[in-house]
Amino acid sequence: MDNDFEQDPEQSASPRKPRKGIYILPNLFTLAALFGGFYAIVMAMNGRFDMATIGVFCAMVLDSLDGRVARMTNTQSAFGEQMDSLADMVSFGAAPALIAYEWALKGLGRWGWIAAFVYCACAALRLARFNVNTAVVDKRYFQGLPSPAAAALVTGFIWIMTEAEVTGPSQAWPMFAIALYAGLTMVTNVPFYSGKDVHFKKSVPFAVVVLLALAIAVINIHPPAVLFGLFMVYGLSGYVLYAWRKFKGQPASMISTSTDEPDERGLHQ
């Protein structure tokens, strides 16, 4: 007999613990994302800020794929989770801070390295909080600005300025403000939509495919400006959502106090 007792429904709905072991495919994507961050740091040290920013954006694309690859191939593991966090710290924490400092913040003296450190420290705090709150946060939203989006704000500004041939020292204070905004927003409780409730395996109307094609075409018009604009909108959207929830009298926190309610089941996996 396979089972001597009937499994409790709440047990079956609880998330499975990540398996122990190391799987090649998802960790290859994670290592590639880590290389993107490392490459960005090297390029910044050599004054190639355009290539440094592209390295961070490439790391963002690869970082968005490793988790999906692991789920699709059923190769999630505790090792992969830890590896992903460490790679994110390099690519979206240390790399953007160093790029911003080398490009513009260096000219502000102590204020420059303080802004760079605040961003880097907030990225570390954001990633640590994400790891410990995974089971209690509504998966439809991020608690605070996600580190890849924060990195996109910092490096996207540098990318668009270098494309326009604007020198870093002339943009020191705007860079200071963006670094602080991105860093501090990472550690707030402001909700940002995660998109994790979108099911890619379900069929979609043909119009959605057309819109995706148009979006790709628009991005290719001028990638630095379009991408920076999109992430600026996203970086402000959390505060709009927070204000709207407050106005409607809804809880603004993404941490649930109960997982027993029917509308909350499955939202914390």
Regions found by a protein language model. Give the residues of each.
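Short, amphipathic, aromatic/basic-enriched membrane-interface segments that mark the entry/exit
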Residues: R19-N27, F79-A87, R140-Q143, S194-V204
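Helix-coil boundary and interhelical linker segments in multi-pass alpha-helical membrane proteins
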Residues: Y39-I54, A94-I114, G156-P174, N220-A225
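Juxtamembrane membrane-interface segments at transmembrane alpha-helix termini
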Residues: S64-M72, A124-N131, T188-N189, Y239-P251
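"…together with the soluble PPM/PP2C metallo-phosphatase catalytic core" -> "…together
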Residues: P18-F29, G36-F49, I54, A104-T134, ...
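Short hydrophobic alpha-helical membrane-embedded segments
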Residues: N27-L34, L86-G93, A149, K201-L212
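Topogenic membrane-insertion module of multi-pass membrane proteins
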Residues: M1-S64, L241, P251, L267-Q269
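Multi-pass membrane catalytic core of lipid/isoprenoid biosynthesis enzymes
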Residues: I22-T30, M72-L127, G156-W159
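C-terminal membrane-associated helical module and adjoining short loops/tails
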Residues: M1-S14, K139-Q269
